[in-house]
Amino acid sequence: YTGLYVVYDEFSKYLEANIKEASVSDTKTLQDFAEKCNRSGSMQLHLMLISHKEISNYIDTLPKQKVDGWRGVSERFKHIHLNNNFSQTYEIIASVIQKEPTKWARFQKNHQKDLEELLGRYKNHPLFSANSTELETAIMGCYPLHPVSTFILPRLSERVAQNERTLFTFLSAEGTSTLRSFIDVYDDDSFNLITPDEIYDYFEPLFKKETFGGEIHDIYLLTSAILSSLAVHSLEAKIVKTLSLIYVLEQFERLKPTKDEIVGVYSSSFSVKDINAAIDNLIEKEYVIYL
């Protein structure tokens, strides 16, 4: 026996649900625990808090006294950032979505213009690295996923997935709003993409289960309220679901909630005129502020 290692998984969910109610005594207890860890000698004591974001990202709206307390907590920890290799994840997705070589070659020839437009739009987009292999895998290998869906899927799964609904169950399981359900009605001669709204539909049950008062749950409640006023399969509803996922991910430096991004997602299925009209309709009804 050489010591104790305490791991608090999903600490971010605790912060989202309780940070406003947490007392000064609560933060003091955590500070004392961290300080004890830092002073432990041969009988080591470690405390690991696993969170999606830095503590500083959760305290913006707190009173100054609480902000100071949480900053004191944060300063007592060594911050380690883990960056997943999503390029490998795209390769895994591509390996799951197997294509019959002869038919796929014919499809690429018939839809060369559509595929080139996708490659052209996302070639210099911050969604993917400048590595041409990653872009090729994300667009060609992961087809029929839209490139934005390919970007969102593993990151969303990382944030909210549970055993019954993950990146891999979306790709392999039967049921509604899965890859298989899309392929079952897919026309091999058409250029159709799985857009982010379908990923929203698949993970929606998990949004409901998110911690009440947490950021993701609040986004879900707002999204549901707006969707209740829209036709189920309307372009407006699809756009709202996509915007919701963009805000859940919070990676605005790479995926922004802008009109151009929405046009990029839906221009293979709808005219730019129709997309702009749908966005204008949402703005007019004050379902979105302005894109």
Regions found by a protein language model. Give the residues of each.
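Conserved P-loop NTPase "ATPase switch" module shared by AAA+ and STAND
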Residues: 2-26
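Beta-sheet entry/capping signal
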Residues: 2-6, 44-49, 77-81, 141-142, ...
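Substrate-gripping "pore-loop 1 plus following alpha2 helix"
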Residues: 20-33, 61-66
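Secondary-structure transition/capping motifs at alpha-helix termini
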Residues: 1-2, 21-25, 35-45, 232-233, ...
